[in-house]
A protein has these predicted regions:
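Long, contiguous N-terminal structural blocks used for assembly/anchoring
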Residues: 1-26
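Short amphipathic alpha-helical segments that mediate assembly, nucleic-acid/protein binding
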Residues: 6, 29-32, 84
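Surface-exposed polar/charged interaction patches
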Residues: 12, 16, 42, 93-97
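Acidic, Ser/Pro/Thr-rich low-complexity regulatory regions
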Residues: 15-20, 29-33, 99-103, 109
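Structured alpha/beta or helical-core interaction and ligand-binding surfaces enriched in interleaved
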Residues: 18, 25-35, 41, 72-76
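N-terminal targeting/docking segments
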Residues: 22, 28, 47-49
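Acidic, low-complexity, intrinsically disordered interaction modules
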Residues: 44-85, 90
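Amphipathic alpha-helical binding modules
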Residues: 77-110
């Protein structure tokens, strides 16, 4: 896929975390996993991500959970693949509280 498809997906399925233009976009878990899959055949790496709980008033409360991937000396393509795998594993293994409205922000190196 391409970064353009990824950005289009974020616009369609994501929710802006703040009112800032070009700011972070939060996604529900299935959409976050799909967004990462859209970057599969690119050299775009995932620097990390943050977890938020959406409160009733629309405020994204930090859950103080996150992940990150160090680039080290990896080539870009290797880092991109490694970091996407790490992000997907984090999302799949993250246990959401049943009564919480959990959202994820993905941080790319682009």
């Amino acid at each position: 896929m391409s970064y353009v498809k990824y950005e289009e997906f974020l616009k369609k399925y994501g929710t802006p975390r703040t009112d800032a233009e070009g700011g972070e976009v939060a996604l529900k878990k299935p959409d976050a996993i799909k967004a990462l899959d859209l970057l599969k055949n690119t050299d775009i790496g995932i620097l990390g991500g943050d977890v938020y709980e959406l409160e009733g008033d629309g405020y994204f409360q930090p859950a103080y959970d996150n992940w990150y991937c160090d680039k080290n000396s990896d080539e870009q393509a290797i880092f991109a693949k490694k970091s996407r795998k790490m992000a997907i594993e984090y999302l799949l293994n993250y246990e959401e509280k049943p009564d919480a409205d959990i959202w994820y922000v993905i941080v790319t190196d682009r």
